[in-house]
């Protein structure tokens, strides 16, 4: 099987590379699936993130029609606060609003991973509880000025400057980054890829 990552995220690419544990025979391609990420009316966060991961994997599979036996990995990450999905910010003001909402509180990060081939799609969902320290307006302004939050669900990246705001996590660190390693390895192992 030929492994394909249906994402152009540098964070997901780096994490998937780790799964190979440095083996030269662990390789993968990347494609950029284009899907509608709009939540459906009444859709629960768990259902939403799993649907997007599956749709990304299926859209990636469609982009690999010229490849022999593709196995496509799709993933999506959301931040949930009081059952509200906090996606990527639309502008600086939105990022600041989200960071103020997260300040001093716990929230859930959900990452779904789907592995699709021509016959089957397998799925894993991982949830991690993240608690933020209290953020000052100066912290929020400086962080947003760095532009780091602008392409990240929940307006922060735990692996970057945003990690300074994380008081504690209960669960998978790699889930918060965007690709839960243990569960992704399980999917790849079950499919005979590793």
Curated annotation (Swiss-Prot):
Pfam families for the chain: Maf
EC code(s) of this entry: 3.6.1.9
Family according to the record: Belongs to the Maf family. YhdE subfamily.
NCBIfam families, per the entry: maf (TIGR00172)
SUPFAM superfamilies for the chain: ITPase-like
InterPro entries according to UniProt: ITPase-like_fam, Maf-like
GO cellular component terms, A-Z: cytoplasm
One GO MF term attached to the UniProt entry: nucleoside triphosphate diphosphatase activity
Residue positions of the active site: 76 (proton acceptor)
Any Gene Ontology biological process: nucleotide metabolic process
Keywords: Cytoplasm, Hydrolase, Nucleotide metabolism
Keyword Signal: no
Top enzyme class: hydrolase
Protein name: dTTP/UTP pyrophosphatase
Function: Nucleoside triphosphate pyrophosphatase that hydrolyzes dTTP and UTP. May have a dual role in cell division arrest and in preventing the incorporation of modified nucleotides into cellular nucleic acids.
Site (Important for substrate specificity): 11, 77, 159
Cellular compartment(s): Cytoplasm
PANTHER family: BIFUNCTIONAL DTTP/UTP PYROPHOSPHATASE/METHYLTRANSFERASE PROTEIN-RELATED, BIFUNCTIONAL DTTP_UTP PYROPHOSPHATASE_METHYLTRANSFERASE PROTEIN-RELATED
Required cofactor(s): a divalent metal cation
Reaction(s) the record says it catalyses: dTTP + H2O = dTMP + diphosphate + H(+); UTP + H2O = UMP + diphosphate + H(+)
């Amino acid at each position: 099987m030929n492994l394909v990552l249906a994402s152009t995220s540098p964070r997901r690419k780096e994490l998937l590379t780790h799964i190979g544990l440095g083996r030269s025979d662990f390789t993968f391609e990347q494609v950029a699936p284009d899907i509608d990420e709009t939540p459906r009316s009444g859709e629960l966060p768990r259902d939403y993130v799993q649907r997007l991961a599956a749709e990304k994997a299926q859209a990636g599979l469609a982009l690999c029609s010229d490849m022999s036996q593709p196995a496509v990995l799709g993933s999506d990450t959301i931040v949930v606060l009081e059952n509200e999905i906090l996606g990527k910010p639309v502008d600086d003001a939105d990022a600041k609003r989200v960071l103020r909402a997260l300040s001093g509180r716990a929230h859930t990060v959900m990452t779904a991973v789907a592995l699709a081939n021509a016959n089957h799609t397998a799925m894993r969902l991982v949830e991690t509880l993240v608690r933020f320290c209290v953020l000052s307006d100066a912290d929020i302004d400086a962080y947003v000025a760095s532009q780091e939050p602008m392409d990240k669900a929940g307006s922060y990246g735990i692996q970057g400057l945003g990690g300074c705001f994380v008081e504690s996590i209960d669960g998978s660190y790699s889930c918060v980054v965007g690709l839960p390693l243990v569960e992704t390895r399980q999917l790849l192992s079950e499919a005979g890829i590793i």
